[in-house]
């Protein structure tokens, strides 16, 4: 998912990539493409490079003023992404809660209630 969707531990990752448990974001597989692209490769909705050329150069960095409050400009994807709270020392068995933008904050998710399945 993009920066506004659930993290990869909850939503999974596309084929060929893995979930980084520290950032809760998908890591991108290496692009193996025999095409030279003067402006670099296009990116998928996950922010991973794909074997298609960009038609114009990518901006050096996105503008922080373009990002909603509580988010930052990612140099990797040139998109607004969640800030990671490096001061949060909580160990949460069900993960951290997320705000309305899909960003984690330093509060544990409650225990999941088990609902019996009907046969």
UniProtKB/Swiss-Prot annotation:
Domain Antistasin-like: 28-53, 83-108
PROSITE patterns in the record: ANTISTASIN (PS51252)
Binding of heparin, residues: 97-100, 111-118
GO molecular function, one term: heparin binding
Any Gene Ontology biological process: negative regulation of coagulation
Subcellular location: Secreted
Pfam family, one: Antistasin
Residues marked Reactive bond (site): 34-35, 89-90
Coiled-coil spans in chain: none
Modified residues (Pyrrolidone carboxylic acid): 1
Keyword match Lipid metabolism: no
Segments traversing the membrane: none
S-S bridge residues: 8-19, 13-26, 28-48, 33-51, 37-53, 62-73, 67-80, 82-103, 88-106, 92-108
Cellular component aspect of the GO annotation: extracellular region
General function of this protein: This highly disulfide-bonded protein is a potent inhibitor of factor Xa. May have therapeutic utility as an anticoagulant. Also exhibits a strong metastatic activity.
Family from the record: Belongs to the protease inhibitor I15 (antistasin) family.
The protein's name: Ghilanten
Organism: Haementeria ghilianii (Amazon leech)
């Amino acid at each position: 998912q993009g920066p506004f969707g659930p993290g990869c531990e909850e939503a999974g990752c596309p084929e060929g990539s893995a979930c980084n448990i520290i950032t809760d974001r998908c890591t991108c597989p290496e692009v193996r493409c025999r095409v030279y692209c003067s402006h670099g490769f296009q990116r998928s909705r996950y922010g991973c490079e794909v074997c298609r050329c960009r038609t114009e150069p990518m901006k050096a960095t996105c503008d922080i003023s373009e990002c909603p409050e509580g988010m930052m400009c990612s140099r990797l994807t040139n998109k607004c992404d969640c800030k990671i709270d490096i001061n949060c020392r909580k160990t949460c068995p069900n993960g951290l809660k997320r705000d309305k933008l899909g960003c984690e904050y330093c509060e544990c998710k409650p225990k999941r209630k088990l609902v019996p399945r009907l046969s």
